[in-house]
């Protein structure tokens, strides 16, 4: 609802959407308490947080939209307000169910199990791996990345350990209240790099805005999310949004300090290309313009997230990162994606517990516990999605080498990217 009423659609289209969709939300909330028959503790905690913070959409955002839309009829306005009021009531009932009833049901786990996981690898992702070979590959690549990090750390300062250097790097961050501006600066710089070096053709009038993430979503990811353009906006642009969790005044000192070291210059500079230029923003524009309805309306993490991580590597290869410290941070972020392969297959096939996965992220990758929890939570609810980053990147790099051999002297990296994005 929030994305639609704040998106590029016309006022009339948004009204039609609300009238059609609000009754569905009401029905979903009524059905939810009947469908939830098992208690998964962490899911309950997260669901309760989101339910408690979702009422602002119907209390504030919908009303604000109606005030801004002069074309809405009185009947439609009253209908939308009535549905919103009913949804708020249903949210209260559902919130009470989550808080007081669901914990009394039989406790369960989120793992899909070894057999189902292997079927997913074979039939959904069309991969040759099974849970055992994927687990082995994940650890091999994890250890290889660790070795590269140690080698680079010695070049930077041989008197310090890799961990000590990374702590220093993560303590270099923007002014807390200028996080949006800092992210926007490096988004714009990544766009300039892609265009000036002719790495990927971008034939559309487009832009990316960095904005604060909606409050009700801030506990679902420690960082934020990318919201691709849904079409041409009122100014004639395909405008995407990179939504980040902002720095909050009400936090205690510990929370503020932890937030800042997870929003350092390194992570901003490396993640901007992944999310925007030439990552998700550009890939989404090509997908939107694909003549195949199947390709236009469907995707898979092996390509979309693999493409994002590939762009982090592409920026390393083409000299975007300003110094060796940022390059070390890039390797640490790659290690994070290596770990995603390990904990995804590990948790869902029974090789790792939830706490084992948290420990992998905190002890080996360097995450703070709260950030690791949000990370693992996302994987637990979307089995297989997070392996797409590293596995997808490795497949794209293999294709690039094959394409280079085929084209020989006629090889063009821009042409390769364009052909791949247009498939």
Segment roles from a protein language model:
Residues 1-423:
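N-terminal maturation segment of proteins
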């Amino acid at each position: 609802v929030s994305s639609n009423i704040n998106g590029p659609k016309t006022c009339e289209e948004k009204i039609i959407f609300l009238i059609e969709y609000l009754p569905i939300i009401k029905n979903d909330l009524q059905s939810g308490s009947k469908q939830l028959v098992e208690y998964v503790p962490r899911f309950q905690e997260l669901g309760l947080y989101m339910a408690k913070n979702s009422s602002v959409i119907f209390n504030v955002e919908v009303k604000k939209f109606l005030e801004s839309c002069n074309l809405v009829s009185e009947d439609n306005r009253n209908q939308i307000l009535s549905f919103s009021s009913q949804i708020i009531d249903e949210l209260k009932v559902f919130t009470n169910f989550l808080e007081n009833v669901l914990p009394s049901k039989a406790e369960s786990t989120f793992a899909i199990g070894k057999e189902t996981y292997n079927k997913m690898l074979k039939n959904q992702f069309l991969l040759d791996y099974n849970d055992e070979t994927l687990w082995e590959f994940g650890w091999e690549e994890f250890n290889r990345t660790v070795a590269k990090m140690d080698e680079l750390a010695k070049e930077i300062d041989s008197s310090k350990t890799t961990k000590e250097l990374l702590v220093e790097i993560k303590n270099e961050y923007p002014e807390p209240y200028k996080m949006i501006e800092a992210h926007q600066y490096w988004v714009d710089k990544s766009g300039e790099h892609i265009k000036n070096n002719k790495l990927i053709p971008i034939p559309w009038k487009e832009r990316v805005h960095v904005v604060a993430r909606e409050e009700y979503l801030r506990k679902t990811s420690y960082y934020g999310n990318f919201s691709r353009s849904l079409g041409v906006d009122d100014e004639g642009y395909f405008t995407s949004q990179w939504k980040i969790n902002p720095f909050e005044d009400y936090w205690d000192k510990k929370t503020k300090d932890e937030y800042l070291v997870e929003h350092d210059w390194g992570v901003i500079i490396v993640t901007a290309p992944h999310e925007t230029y030439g990552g998700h923003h550009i890939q989404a524009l090509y997908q939107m313009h694909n003549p195949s309805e199947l390709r236009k309306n469907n995707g898979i993490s092996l390509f979309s997230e693999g493409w994002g991580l590939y762009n982090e590597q592409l920026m390393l290869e083409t000299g975007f990162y300003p110094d060796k410290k940022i390059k070390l941070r890039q390797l640490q972020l790659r290690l994070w994606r290596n770990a995603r392969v390990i904990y995804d297959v590990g948790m869902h096939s029974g090789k790792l517990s939830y706490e084992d996965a948290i420990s992998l992220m905190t002890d080996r990758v360097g995450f703070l516990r709260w950030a690791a929890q949000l990370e693992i939570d996302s994987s637990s609810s979307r089995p297989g999605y997070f392996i797409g980053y590293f596995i997808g990147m490795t497949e794209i790099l293999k294709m690039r080498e094959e394409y280079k051999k085929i084209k020989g002297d006629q090889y063009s990296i821009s042409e390769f990217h364009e052909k791949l994005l247009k498939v």
